[in-house]
A protein has these predicted regions:
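Asp-box/WD-like beta-propeller blade repeats and closely related beta-sheet repeat scaffolds
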Residues: 1-14
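Long, well-ordered core segments of solenoidal/helical folds
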Residues: 1-4, 34-54, 88-105, 158-169
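Well-ordered alpha-helical segments within folded domains of soluble proteins
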Residues: 11-28, 61-78, 128-144, 200-210, ...
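Structural helix-adjacent loops and short alpha-helical linkers that scaffold large soluble proteins
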Residues: 27-40, 77-90, 97, 143-154, ...
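C-terminal beta-rich recognition modules with glycine/proline-rich loops and embedded aromatic residues
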Residues: 89, 153-162, 167-258, 282, ...
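Flexible glycine/proline-rich, aromatic-decorated loop/lid segments
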Residues: 100-118
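Beta-strand-rich binding/interaction modules
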Residues: 262-282
Length: 425
């Protein structure tokens, strides 16, 4: 017997994850209309209707309750061609990335949205729920399959390196629920037997997905979106491609093509928004780059077995200011968010782990932040190299005051600063 409308509306206000997307997937596999009906049953008017009207009504809603409901709409578009579902998914993505996403590619404060652009009021120890970034990456993959957008690929890279990669403790494999952005906080990791948070599930799954969006294919083209050492086998084209790089610790990536027979193919290399003018060589010969950042460099030619492509993307230091407080900003080197390392003073056990004896400890964690941590940075947009000196060891820098600065993904078991107090020089 059908549920009364008020009962069903009350039920779907809760966080039910991706069950509606799962029903759409079952419909795709079976063609059984009952699954499509069930997916539609979980349509949440209060969430989806404002997006249909192109309104940012996110307010203080629970972030990861919201994103899977949009993912279901993206899947609905793919299966039914519903134009409203496509438009609202794209509007939501652009709204999230443009007005609700911090520099590392994460969103939310204490699991909730905040008013558009009001970032400086929400730099807390409870920012950046991992599940939210996991699902935004998932939505990004849907959007890129609809249209090969370098903007979407830029975000994917930013979130993958700065949030997902740095979310796992390299010493134990444990993962963090939040990515704290308050100065002086540290990452808080799960424990092996007592922390079964949602972000443990999505966290572990995320680290099995690094190969998922390196390459995309069109009918006669290949998109190279991420610069990650990898091998691609495209059986239909008789193509094997090998990518070799130490990015982001080096600026160059090298691709070698192995072909059963010569073939014409457009290889599309992402030209990131953060890059200076790239240099491109095919079999050692320079190729003129006419494109602009946030586009694709297209190498459309007849390829032969053993052909080589070498691309160098110049990286530079930059300060990304908060829109509501330009005196606060995050340091980036290329797509990599840099953090100042602030040591371990005041970190009391069970730090850096969650306390299994306290329910939802990650949500009320006391960081015991010491006073007087060096979180200010004299900054000069014209001469950033005067502010930060590279030490020659990977992506390691040091400030004039002696604070070591590393990629955020490399800072573990220590306090850090991501959003600096900027003092203009």
């Amino acid at each position: 017997r059908p549920l009364p409308e008020e009962t069903s509306r009350k039920m779907i206000r809760n966080e039910f994850g991706g069950i509606n997307e799962s029903f759409y997937n079952l419909y795709a596999l079976t063609g059984d209309e009952r699954y499509r009906w069930l997916a539609g049953f979980f349509y949440h008017n209060d969430v989806i209707d404002p997006l249909k009207e192109q309104r940012d009504d996110l307010g203080t809603k629970h972030t990861n309750t919201f994103i899977p409901k949009v993912l279901a709409e993206a899947r609905n578009y793919e299966l039914t061609g519903d134009g409203d579902s496509k438009a609202l998914s794209e509007f939501f993505w652009h709204t999230m990335i443009g007005r609700h996403t911090f520099a590392p590619g994460c969103s939310s404060d204490k699991e909730h949205y905040f008013d558009p652009d009001e970032f400086s009021k929400h730099i807390s120890g409870y920012t950046g729920e991992t599940c939210c970034t996991y699902n935004m990456l998932k939505l990004s993959r849907h959007l890129f399959c609809w249209e090969a957008s370098p903007e979407v690929a830029d975000y994917y890279e930013r979130a993958l390196y700065n949030h997902i990669l740095g979310q796992q403790d390299p010493a134990t494999g444990m993962v963090s629920y939040f990515l704290p952005l308050q100065s002086g906080t540290h990452k808080v990791y799960s424990t092996p037997e007592n922390s079964f948070w949602c972000c443990v599930g999505s966290g572990f799954e995320s680290h099995a997905k690094y190969a998922e969006s390196i390459y995309y294919r069109g009918e006669d083209c290949l998109y190279v979106n991420l610069f990650i050492p990898s091998e691609l086998a495209w059986k239909e084209k008789g193509l094997n491609l090998r990518q070799e790089t130490r990015f982001p610790e080096e600026e160059t990536t090298r691709l070698t093509l192995a072909l059963e027979t010569p073939r014409r193919l457009a290889v599309k290399l992402r030209y990131p928004s953060w890059s200076g003018r790239p240099t491109v060589r095919v079999n050692g010969k320079s190729v003129r780059v006419k494109q602009h950042p946030r586009s694709y460099i297209t190498l459309d030619r007849r390829w032969e077995d053993g052909d080589r492509i070498e691309v160098t993307y110049p990286m530079r230091l930059a300060m990304e200011r908060m829109p509501d407080n330009p005196r606060k900003g995050a340091l980036l080197y290329g797509p990599v968010v840099l953090a100042g390392v602030l040591g371990t003073e005041g970190m009391q056990p069970p730090a850096p782990y969650s306390n299994p004896l306290r329910y939802n400890d990650y949500y009320i964690y006391d960081y015991h932040i010491p006073q007087g941590l060096p979180c200010s940075l004299p900054w000069d947009d014209r001469h950033p190299e005067r502010v930060l000196k590279r030490t020659g060891k990977g992506l390691t820098f040091v400030t004039e005051s002696g604070v070591q600065v590393l990629p955020l993904y490399d800072v573990h078991r220590q306090r850090y600063v991501v959003y600096w107090d900027c003092m203009e020089q």
